[in-house]
Curated annotation (Swiss-Prot):
Binds 1 Fe cation per subunit. Binds 1 zinc ion per subunit. Keywords: Glycoprotein, Hydrolase, Iron, Metal-binding, Secreted, Signal, Zinc. Glycans are attached at N30. Its main location: secreted. Zn(2+) binds at D179, N212, H296, H333. Its cofactor is Fe cation; Zn(2+). It is found in: Secreted. This is Purple acid phosphatase 21. Belongs to the metallophosphoesterase superfamily. Purple acid phosphatase family. One of its GO terms (molecular function) is metal ion binding. Expressed flowers and siliques. One of its GO terms (cellular component) is extracellular region. It comes from Arabidopsis thaliana (Mouse-ear cress).
């Protein structure tokens, strides 16, 4: 414990001098938030063969990927699972990877794809033949379905509060639009982050995309980026025919979700552009009536922090999303919450997606408090507070969105809206308003 306190102090000390700060002035809301919290370090304290940092993610139709780490390199990449506690009637082997960074060694990172699994069913599982028993519930195969959403998590007391509030109400899938651990090359922080979220991420699938804090260019001849992220957070890119772990898609219930990469090429000649174009063309709105997109850098924002950083990506990809009739676009990066009217090409458009910035998970850099004034008529609601969101898809036509502000022991609903998919509007469905993808 003493070593962990020293480690936490050294990390906090270095980050204090190396990290940018958000000026806490010109507050655009009447809700007052205390200063940012220090890092919340979670130690292991178990034998080396014990699985740790357990999390799950969707991995194609009726399958789940279980990821865990062991310090002992001899532990098998294997998951036992079944529908009853301590009774595992199935066992699946997987793969493993590892990486080094100067004197740091990641240990053995295991990825095991299990299934086929039944929808809306609780499974019990054990990793590597050792350690604790975990359990998860698979998402439903049809509506309703509920997503919990929070970006820019980090690992502070505010992160803990956000995760606690999310845990209080059930959900089916967690969406994280980038900036996970805020390790920023301090590799032990990846381990601490994995331990911090294990109690939640081992029970429901976490679907994530990368942010700028995941870039972590390694000081090698080839300057590899995203090495830690790609090793630890293997998403279903192969299952969605993407050649990169930085962008992919997945289906759950009646929702097709596309996770885009803000920090990998997206221009019209890029692999990501061609993959996105092909992916959207294959969407069958009879099978997946809802279409959701998640990315890190917002295309629309009225906050002064990172203003305009998503403009090039918007110019390259927005028309694809519009023609595909995307319903909702989530982003992070700006440490605030903001919800826009349906937009296309910087104008209100009832056939465009509803854009939501939700980079308020609890990161160490604090909140982005400086909004542009007066408030744009396109911006429906904005507030600089930590919290999380809930997207509940009720049926093929109706959905409900709510944003839950972290308020001491309670998680109060500060913003909510019920809406219908633009796809169901005869005006928006007309080919007169849509071109080919």
């Amino acid at each position: 414990m003493k070593k962990m306190k020293i480690f936490g102090f050294l990390i906090s000390f270095s980050l204090f001098f190396l990290s940018p700060f958000v000026c806490q002035a010109n507050y655009d809301s009447n809700f007052t938030r205390p200063p940012p919290r220090p890092l919340f370090i979670v130690s292991h304290g178990r034998p080396k063969f014990y699985p740790q940092q357990v999390h799950i993610s969707l991995a194609g139709k009726d399958h789940m990927r279980v990821t865990y780490t062991t310090d002992d390199l001899n532990v098998a990449s294997m998951v036992e699972y079944g529908k009853h506690p301590k009774k595992y009637d199935k066992k699946t082997a997987g793969e493993s990877t590892s990486y080094t960074y100067f004197f740091y060694n990641s240990g053995k990172i295991h990825h095991v794809k299990i299934g086929p699994l039944k929808p809306n069913t609780k499974y019990y599982y054990r990793c590597g033949g050792h350690g604790d028993e975990f359990s998860f519930k698979t998402p439903p195969s049809k509506f309703p379905i509920e997503f919990a959403v929070a970006g820019d998590l980090g690992q502070t007391d505010w992160t803990v509060r956000t995760l606690d509030q999310i845990r209080k109400r059930d959900f089916d899938v967690f969406l994280l639009p980038g900036d996970l651990s805020y390790a920023d090359t301090h590799q032990p922080l990846w381990d601490s982050f994995g331990r911090l979220l294990e109690t939640l991420a081992s029970t429901r699938p976490w679907m994530v995309t990368e942010g700028n804090h995941e870039i972590e260019s390694f000081p090698t001849n080839d300057h590899i980026s995203f090495k830690s992220y790609n090793a630890r957070w293997l998403m279903p890119h192969a299952e969605s025919l993407s050649h990169s772990n930085l962008y992919y898609s997945f289906d759950v219930a009646g929702v097709h979700t596309v996770m885009l990469g803000s920090y990998t090429p997206y221009e019209s000649h890029s692999d990501q552009y061609h993959w996105l174009q092909a992916d959207l063309r294959k969407v069958d709105r009879k099978k997946t009536p809802w279409l959701v997109v998640v990315m890190h850098t917002p295309w629309y924002s009225t906050n002064k922090a990172h203003y305009g950083e998503g403009e090039k990506m918007r110019s390259a990809l927005e028309s694809l999303l519009y023609r595909a009739q995307v319903d909702v676009v989530f982003a992070g990066h700006v440490h605030t919450y903001e919800r826009f009217k349906p937009i296309y090409n910087k104008k209100a458009d009832p056939c465009g997606p509803m854009y939501i910035t939700i980079g308020d998970g609890g990161n160490r850099e604090g909140l982005a408090l400086r909004f542009k004034k007066p408030q744009s008529p396109l911006s429906e609601f904005r507030e600089s507070s930590f919290g999380h969101g809930r997207l509940r898809i009720i049926d093929h036509k109706r959905a409900h969105w709510s944003w839950h502000r972290n308020n001491d022991e309670m998680s109060s609903i500060a913003d909510e809206v019920s809406f219908e998919s633009p796809r169901t509007s005869s005006h928006c469905h007309s080919n007169r308003y849509r071109g080919e993808i």
